[in-house]
Amino acid sequence: MHLKKGKRSIGTVWRLLWKRLYSVHYKTNTYSTRSRKKLVTNFTRVNGLLLSCNGDTFPYMRTLWRYFNAPGNLMFVTTNIITFTGIVAYNTMVTVSNERVFEEQMIAAQMSLAKQKEELETRALDFPANHEQIKEADDANCEQPAIERSGEDRSVKQQNEQLDSPIRHYSLTDLVLNKEARVADYDSQRVKASLFHMLYAYMLYRDTIQPNSDSPNHNSEEWRHEVELLTRDKWLQGAHQRIDVFYDLWNNQLDKIVTSPEKVQNFHLPNWSKYPTLLKFICTELHNNELTTLDEFKQFYGKVRSNEVKKLLGLWLYDHSFLFPRNIYDNKNQEVFYDTLISDSMQDNKIFQKYSSIVMNPDNERTQLFFPNIYAQPVNKPIPSISLETYTRLLRGYITLQETNCKYDYNDNIFKLISILKMNCFLQHDKKIRTGASVRILLPRDEDRSPVLNTIPQAEKKTCYQILSKNRDILALLKRISDIQIDSS
């Protein structure tokens, strides 16, 4: 289309453009009236660049064009598009802001821990020189019960041996033994033998140093007689009631004796009808439970209601976890049991640190027992991982210890947990549960750390940070870490 200057009017140019774009052929007729001439345009066909579609091929195209061609509808659609674009832009800005705030809080928490550690090291120089010696002497006196004292004279020992033995000697007529039964699984029998002897010894130990506990009137005469024989000895004076002290003594001195191969093979539960109520219940559960897997031990642990017995079982399981087989990949139930052990040990510093060391020290073999594994191609072997809920529970426990316990400093543990979250997080997509990706934390060994963590893309890390920035529990714990520094200063 070539236009020569002065040859075509504006109306002519407009009609040519309209015809080129929309190809609406029209014919203008002039009708004369009395007052003026009137132009009437008749549209005859539609065959242009924008409306090149035939009405028969797309029957709704003409209706759709009329809808969008209306000024009100066009304004409505444009407003919706602009609004949607604004919402998307706002959400993007909020997400980026939350991610930046989360990273700043992690950095602030780490700086707070480092500053508090420097203050504690500086403050430690002001303590008197004999303070540590006094504290070590008190701890030694506290944790060394009178049972370990070997300063008795030989004459006193001989007199004690002449007294009635506190251990009852059973005859074959007193025991109900099933001679036809054979050992089905050596590890299972060893678990039962070890647990029975430990809990039996603890019940006697507890009733001896604290005779008024557990309603002694409900105990049988035989049990009370054994307790009375033990209370006669002078070496029981000053015996400590701490469960961890008893367990350490029993584990170091008696466990290997009662779990020797010969004793394990011939082990049978005795007639427990004369035992206290709690010990009767324990013997019944040991008899009914095979205790061949960690799930079965979890069932046994869950039925116990005594907090003291649960503490003993927790200490025992940590040292005897090798008796249970490992399930390499499907360990979700075991991780739930680990969370239960952590929750039950919040009030016991020693047990809590034992089980938290499984996560803090990836070389700990117990990670293969409690946590599910992720197969890592760079190292060609499974790598254990923990859930965000398990991590949150551990971090909360150490923060609580730091806030309430002034005897020890847990800043290093908290700092290490924050570093683990920052470096080892990744996304896991569960095909069975359609709830999107979840954040988990890898626990690679030191030799596998670099090849495994380098395979996590930066985009995946960024997505993890976005999810963590919306987690209220994590943000609240990071704020508590910063508040510890403020309160200490």
UniProtKB/Swiss-Prot annotation:
**GO CC terms of this entry:** mitochondrial inner membrane
Please provide the Gene Ontology terms (biological process) for this protein: regulation of translation
Where is the protein localized? Mitochondrion inner membrane
> How is it placed in the membrane, per its record?
Peripheral membrane protein
**Keyword terms of this UniProt record:** Activator, Membrane, Mitochondrion, Mitochondrion inner membrane, Translation regulation
Has the keyword rRNA-binding been applied to this entry?
no
Does the record's keyword annotation contain Ligase?
A: no
* Purpose of the protein: Required for the expression of the mitochondrial gene for cytochrome c oxidase subunit III (COX3).
Name it.
COX3 mRNA-specific translational activator PET494
Source species:
Saccharomyces bayanus (Yeast)
